[in-house]
């Protein structure tokens, strides 16, 4: 018995340290779930279209510009389906073999082992003799993005896309690298992970030298280059193998996937123009000559639309400024083919064909002359959730197309030569997500409003992605948001009403029954009914916002006494509510159609008024021109009528007077002031018959003075062939110069008055 007890005590003592003293066999704590994993808990089986995959992308130092654009393009459903299905899908066997090589699952405890190894190293260094004590390291902030990215790289599956172009009959290019990334993500069996786009970057740097350096790159420039490169690769491959491309139809094994893509609004590309059909739009440059008023048009193709920014503005105002009239004058005149020369003109830009996916580039970087470099503009520019473009031509296709915001590329930094890019993307059924390289986190819808440019910090929206939608889809989305906000408000109210964490079942039942009608009445006015022009959501909290209209526990309806069972199960009939919503939608549609007709009629009336005003202006100008011509003609006739009387004397006297006036005008100014004053005060006498009097204007001043006989070659004493005048004739000839002077001045005044009366 004693030996048995001793053995029992020994066994008990030996088992005590084995329970908690062996650290090697201690269970490793499971890392907590990330917010993204919590949001994906209720998802069903993995889909075949890749819409339920949420992968980050590894940053290789300065490749955030590439990661943000690739994420935005992947979550564009029609673009993703077009890339995957062109020219054909990769066979399942080849894709699975490639995924077996490229998909790697890291050790989930690698970060714990790395931390333990680092702790051991620090302890060993501290025990060495002569070594200074190590400074205590600051613990890492587990909420920082850098720590979360490091943890994601150590715990999530890593997917490295491989070159698989030969399996679908194409040569390696930037398009095939993009297709390999998309197909790898779609074909993987994990919903979350990290893509390593090393092969894509290698092809990009091989074909384009500007991306080989470690400099900061521009996300908008990369987007434009990528779309043009995809178009070039697809068209080049189609020209090599036209017959193979035409015969590449969907195989029976993935017809279900094609049906899913068609139901989601995307189309399988049967031609090489699928990039043009998605992103391409047409701009029309209208130039009107102000001389002949002829309008000339020139079409331009765009894959993205770049707009200038103004302080405290919106995307709508920026687009209005983009299509504003520009005056072409001075050195920037327009060469009119109709007029045959440079003329002043008015120029405006309008959209003739709208793209299905609208990429709006906000020009945040502007060149300044004083700094001699680009500078970032921190202007506040508001962008809506829903957008309608108004600056379209009269013959535009589908001018009332409605767009919804589905992605925003944000630039974080103080200038164009450094910074960081992230993407905020709206997924199909998981709301808005933040893609920050390796980090993927769910965010609230209002989080998108933080990048207008007026918030503290350096983060501003840089590229906006809008995709086409319908009014019914917008209304359905708003109803879903209202329902979710109401459910969350109900849960909050019920939690607030629970005494000590428990609630009787009958109280919860009565509370929900009495609370439903008030919620339905509260949700009756929606955001679409408030918008007069477009069903766009406001960018600020308003009364109808689900976020701002949610009930709080303070304003919750208090519990009421139990009511009969037949009353508690009587909610508002859903059919009538649905019919009412359909009627409201139909009325809204009819009202918008009527407004559109009125706007067209008003535009036509304004055009007619402008045409009439221009016609009146032209007629008035013609009448004025005719009056001027008539005045000139009458003046010429009068001159011709008066010239035969004294043409010879007038011509000779005029020339002699001009000669004498130009010779001694300054000398004769001081002579005989008395004579000039007396002659100027005398009344103009009548002209002597037979005496030549100038009628074409005032006589020069030298005729008011006695000319020097030596200087005057026309004096009687210097003409030997002319007889001498008598004394009475000389007496009568003494005043004619004054008569000529006064009469000439008077006649000149009368002629001028007459000419002015004709002009008036």
From Swiss-Prot:
Per the record's keyword annotation, is Coiled coil included, yes or no? yes
Function comment: Ubiquitin thioesterase component of the regulatory network controlling carbon source utilization through ubiquitination and deubiquitination involving creA, creB, creC, creD and acrB. Deubiquitinates the creA catabolic repressor and the quinate permease qutD. Also plays a role in response to carbon starvation and the control of extracellular proteases activity.
A GO BP entry: carbon catabolite repression of transcription
- Looking at the record, which segments are called Disordered? 1-28, 114-146, 242-270, 520-760
Coiled-coil boundaries:
575-635
What name does this protein carry? Probable ubiquitin carboxyl-terminal hydrolase creB
Query: Polar residues compositional bias: what residue ranges?
Result: 8-18, 258-270
What family does the database annotate?
Belongs to the peptidase C19 family.
Q: Organism source for this protein?
A: Aspergillus clavatus (strain ATCC 1007 / CBS 513.65 / DSM 816 / NCTC 3887 / NRRL 1 / QM 1276 / 107)
Q: Give the matching PROSITE patterns.
A: USP_1, USP_2, USP_3
Q: Does the keyword GTP-binding apply?
A: no
